Amino acid sequence: MNVAHHYDLTDDLYDLFLDPKRQYSCGYFKNKNDSLETAQNNKIKHIIKKLNIKPNQKVLDIGCGWGSLALDIAKSINCEVTGITLSENQFDYCVKKAKELNLENQVTFKLIDYRELNEKFDRIVSIGMFEHVGRKFYQNFFKKIEQMLDYEGISLIHTIGSVSPPRDPHPWITRYIFPGGYTPSLSEVIKPVEKAGLIVSDIEVLKLHYSHTLRHWKENCIKNKVEIIEMFDEKFFRMWEFYLAGCETAFKWGDQVVYQFQLTKNYTSTPATRDYIYQ
């Protein structure tokens, strides 16, 4: 299981380089000197604004990670949230966190594949999960989104992508870090979205945000080098540092970006302008 391969490393490792909410995805830097925690909280707020969630709506978070987005949605809006993951470590953590925050009646976490769901949702969000879907399954993924999304609903897909034409993933990343992972070109996403019957209502390209995020992660790893080596070994530390430094370079000097796709079924699901996102 490709997701579990990466995310079921000991949680103690992630605590050594991620922000306190364990957000393992690109932050949103309003200023390049923002702290990692500030940027990650900015990201959550930005996504919640784009989803434009109303009270009592049903929200699905596909690939919910350690639950930060699902829990923050529940804390800020009186709605019903479902978070799903394929990682047992993440699932256990999410359930425990929901209990600690007394949000069990509002947030449900499930250890399940999104393809097994047969419910309707008003809002569907996926952060950093699309990279694991695989090119040959893009059509199936977006068709499933279309089937689960209410006619007046809004979906937001946040994914790493490339500004270059389609190409095979880097073999080192595939072998050592993300087996089965792939970062798509824009052209590879739009076609299956259209075929699924969805409308691209908004696209935002986050350019240097991930390079700033990765810089913070790399610096945190270096700061905690002794603990990481004790947890694993010197070889693992060098591999992890190389992974973070290489990805930082790809986002700063290469062709990697983050795309945020807002998808709907009709033109009236979102406001006429983007002002609501920044109010």
Positions of the model-derived regions?
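Conserved class I S-adenosyl-L-methionine
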Residues: P55-G63
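Conserved SAM-binding loop of SAM-dependent methyltransferases across substrates and taxa
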Residues: W66-I77
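A short glycine-rich, Lys/Arg-flanked "PGG" loop and its adjoining helix->strand segment in the class I
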Residues: Q139-Y151
